[in-house]
Amino acid sequence: MQLNNSKRQMVLGGVAVLAAVAGAGLSQKKQAANLSMEAEQALWNAEFDTPDGRVLKMQNLQGKSLVINFWATWCAPCVEEMPLLDVFFRQNAAKGWQMVGLAIDQPSRVRQYLSQNAISYPIGFAGMSGTDLGRLLGNEQGGLPFTVVLDGKGGLIQRKLGKLSAQEIQAWA
């Protein structure tokens, strides 16, 4: 009986150690899911001109679930995923989801692209400052497309460099 009790204590001790390690891992994951103070300030203070002559103020989107997609007209994967992002936006805008496309491109090319492709979500002309913002949000290589998904509290849900699949996009909702 003593041997069984000893084994039980070892098993319980092992479970306790595993739980502690898992808890520490979750804690680190939560911390990693928060944006740096510099990134938060840069994001919420950013303003971008839009194709229709307005100003897109990122602070107006704070407090809502938000998809930020960095793209360019010359980036084939970017333009391939835009219809998928548009479908997600149209299906989920009424549920409180916001989406912004930040174009790392020349405004004339963006206007031309948008005149030929219906996109429902707001587009901002980010230019090279958009590349800097993308780097602050985790796109160290500066590649496109780059997408960041934030919850309503500004916590990071997903960050992806590269083309999104329909399954990845639908998993956000």
Model-derived regions, located:
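N-terminal targeting signals for export/organelle localization
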Residues: 1-45
